[in-house]
């Protein structure tokens, strides 16, 4: 049964009948609400996720993303931008900035794809330059 369903879905994807993604141009944000790992993630994250959804933002509750001490933590996709200490009041400005191609500086913790030292370097450089465009800086290499 599972094999036939899986085969059917794969055939439909390959034929183009079903798109691989229906993601639109609007950002998708994940809010850590993992209360079993650390209660503050649920206590601080759930109100943020609820506020964003009520405002029409595609906001998902997710499991642990690291940095409990920064709860509520938000990850903005597709760029994988981490923000910490997000509140319901600060959540919408963060999402609106991201939708406009900018990184909201308050609580910015770096990019998921980069190691912690590179994340810190990006944060310091952005503050120094005052440059907050998502695509404004390019990482060419790191050690």
What are these regions (language model features)?
Residues 1-143:
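Histidine/cysteine-enriched polar flanking segments
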């Amino acid at each position: 049964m599972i094999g036939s369903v899986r085969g059917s879905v794969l055939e439909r994807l390959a034929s183009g009948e079903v798109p691989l993604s229906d993601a639109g141009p609007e950002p998708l944000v994940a809010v850590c609400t993992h209360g079993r790992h650390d209660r503050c993630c649920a206590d601080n994250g759930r109100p943020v996720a609820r506020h964003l959804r009520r405002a029409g933002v595609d906001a998902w509750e997710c499991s642990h993303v690291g940095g409990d001490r920064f709860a509520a933590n938000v990850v903005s996709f597709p760029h994988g931008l981490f923000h910490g200490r997000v509140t319901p009041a600060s959540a919408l400005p963060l999402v609106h900035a991201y939708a406009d191609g900018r990184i909201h500086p308050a609580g910015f913790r770096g990019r998921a794809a980069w190691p912690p030292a590179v994340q810190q370097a990006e944060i310091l450089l952005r503050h120094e330059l005052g440059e907050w465009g998502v695509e404004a800086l390019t990482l060419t290499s790191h050690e």
